A protein has these predicted regions:
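Structured, hydrophobic secondary-structure cores that serve as assembly/anchoring elements
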Residues: 1-198
Length: 198
């Protein structure tokens, strides 16, 4: 016996998670949430930057991220926001970051050595998000911040599934809806690392 509805629920959960990741990262705000990377960014500091604009730090290299840029990104974020802060980047960027060393030859990336402990970069957790751009000239490849304070996600409870055995006989159709939203609520809580142009 194969439970079609359970399988559909599982597939829907996966698809909704992927679509939400896209929307919350790069969504343009038209019939979808405005993603964190869709907000304008500037190199202005928190003291002079207008609300709704994110601050970016420009890396010193057009093809790579340096250890100095990572440290600068961390300390551009105010102390109050560093509590609970994480890095966000895609898998390709994470691979490049894992090779970074400090001036004494120590890796900035540390594996989680205990069961259940996550890996860290310079003491902060890492969230993988495949919607973040690769490290390339002018890309905002890495975000660092307290995303819970900086970006709010609102979900209407539950996913609505309508089972329709009548419209397309002998087939059964499934119609699914889910309502969600997201927006930047504290532009000082998230910083971006923008790769240099040249």
């Amino acid at each position: 016996f194969f439970n079609v509805e359970a399988w559909i629920n599982s597939e829907l959960a996966t698809e909704f998670a992927e679509q939400e990741e896209i929307a919350f990262t790069t969504g343009d705000g038209t019939k979808k949430p405005k993603g964190s990377l869709a907000y304008e960014s500037t190199d202005e500091t928190d003291k002079v930057r207008a609300f709704g604009k994110l601050q970016h730090i420009v890396s010193g290299d057009a093809t790579a991220v340096t250890a100095d840029a990572i440290i600068k990104l961390i300390y551009t974020l105010r102390k109050a926001h560093r509590t609970g802060a994480k890095f966000m980047m895609n898998n390709n960027s994470l691979f490049a970051i894992r090779l970074l060393k400090d001036s004494e030859g120590n890796y900035l990336w540390l594996p989680g050595l205990e069961l259940g402990q996550p890996s860290s970069l310079a003491g902060y957790g890492i969230a993988e998000n495949e919607q973040m751009p690769d490290i390339a000239a002018d890309a905002k490849a890495i975000a660092f911040g307290n995303f819970k304070r900086g970006y709010t996600i609102v979900d209407r409870i539950g996913t609505r599934i309508l089972r329709d055995p009548y419209t397309n006989k002998p087939f059964v159709g499934f119609y699914t809806t889910k309502r969600t939203g997201g927006m930047l609520v504290d532009s000082q809580a998230i910083k971006l690392l923008k790769i240099a142009v040249a």
